[in-house]
Amino acid sequence: MKFILATRKSPLALVQTEMVAARLRQKIPGAECDLLKVVTTGDRQAEWSLSKQGGKGLFTAELEQALLRGDAHVAVHSCKDLPGENTPGLIVAGYLPREDVRDVLVLREGVTEPRTIATSSPRRQLQIKQLFPGATFTEIRGNVDTRLRKIAGGLADATILAAAGMNRLGIREWPGVVFRPLKLQESVPAVGQGAIALQCRQETIPLLRDVFDAGTARSVDVERAIQAAVGGGCQIAFAAHVSGDTLHFFHERTGVRTLPLTGADFANPAEAAKRLLGELNFHA
């Protein structure tokens, strides 16, 4: 069978979609893949502040429309770009094996205590402020390599990037900057960070069952259930990450918290979200 994979055009998106294509060919005998390259609203509006615009669906809506029109079988997303709720008629069917989930502090060479940090993410801003209380923040947009060049060129003292994206692009070092991976307690990752999500119509799921990684789904399904229960988009400072049987939770109202998870939580993520938010005394 030939699969049409809808993807953004950025270098990272194309690398991730090629990973999905390779997985399909590996797991499904005779599978062929073509890429449908789509420009999203977030790609077109390169000067927008994502936090002020809300960020919800800015990098996913056009890919979803391609699925709904029948132009593609699968949309390939960075899971952290997806809203918490499913779009009617579509489902996040599964994930590829998860990459390194950590955030990475990118420091301009010679800087140890950054005064200006370029990040548009309220989640990252509020958490990194605990490490560098005197820092101020500025906006930054662009692909991974663009952001690295901007920091090396002096736009700001530092920025924060996802380790997963840099690893997939093969970036281990960059002239003029130094990489410092952040611990989970220093920067709780975004929901789904490090996971590549495969979204499709319901009838496509049986074709893909052998492709998905169960371990990644076990964690990300709980994270996304919490995201849906909390509500909001990129404009709020919120994070949830499942590591083993532990939930790492961050919200501007609670700070960083950790809670144990049970087998029942993984069996019913929606109920788990209610229980966990209740224990945190969090009310959306």
Question: Which ranges hold each PLM region?
Answer:
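Short, structured active-site "lid" loops
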Residues: 47-74
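Structured loop/turn residues at beta-strand edges in well-structured enzyme cores
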Residues: 70, 112-113, 154
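Short, Asp-centered acidic motifs that coordinate Mg2+ and/or phosphate
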Residues: 72-76, 157-158
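A conserved helix-loop-strand patch within extracytoplasmic ligand-binding domains
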Residues: 79-82, 86-138, 196
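Short active-site-adjacent helix-start/loop capping segments
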Residues: 42-47, 75, 83-86
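Small-molecule-sensing regulatory modules
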Residues: 1-39, 45, 52, 125, ...
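Short, well-ordered beta-strand segments
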Residues: 4-6, 75, 93, 118, ...
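A short, hydrophobic beta-strand-centered structural micro-motif
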Residues: 74-75, 79, 242
